[in-house]
Amino acid sequence: MKSKLLLACTILFFCSSFLCGQNQSSKVANSVETNNGCIRHPWQGKRVGYLGDSITDPNCYGDKIKKYWDFLQEWLGITPYVYGISGRQWNDVPRQAEQLKKEHGGEVDAIVILMGTNDFNDGVPIGEWFTETEEQVMAARGQTQKLETRKKRTPIMDGSTYKGRINIGINRLKQLFPDKQIVLLTPLHRSLANFGETNVQ
């Protein structure tokens, strides 16, 4: 319960970087100033898709525990489209994203992903983000173009590693929602959790 409350507070803090009392130079371009001098958050009244695991799953713990997206819904009037399922790992993000697209099309303003704790618990190897090679390319910076050696990074799409799964998930999200804001939240810190005789993590 404490970790979920801490998570909700962290998200609220992250999303509330546009509070009252900011000077003119720090105001966000898409925000609107209200009559009392406060800044209206750019996500006010928006439609947000939530992908994840039990921390996001609306069916996990029923009405006993408010989820982080419940707090954002109350605070900002967000319409939540929630697709998190308990126990899922990063390799489920493409499926959740496709379901979001199927049911809501382009009618989503942003997507939040909170995932990874189950990958860690399952011992999924971390892996690498990309391979790096050198290539000869034509380039110019304030002078006539010439052949230069440049480094090229290619994302590793490896479904057996944590970083590879993230690359695959983000790639699919960008294909489905190329012009939408995507927010990644890091996994929560894990410690011993004894949920019963057959569920100790």
Q: Model features per residue range: what roles?
A:
Residues 1, 14-17, 31, 35, ...:
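Compositionally biased, intrinsically disordered low-complexity segments
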Residues 1-25:
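Bacterial Sec-dependent N-terminal signal peptides
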Residues 12-14, 63, 191:
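Alpha-helical transmembrane segments and their juxtamembrane interfaces
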Residues 21-86, 97-106:
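Serine-esterase "nucleophile elbow" of acetyl-processing enzymes
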Residues 51-54, 83-88, 114-117, 185-189:
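Active-site-proximal beta-strand/loop segments in catalytic clefts of secreted hydrolases
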Residues 75, 96-201:
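Alpha-helical cap/lid subdomain in secreted, periplasmic
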Residues 91-92:
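N-terminal beta-loop-helix "entrance" segment that forms/cooperates
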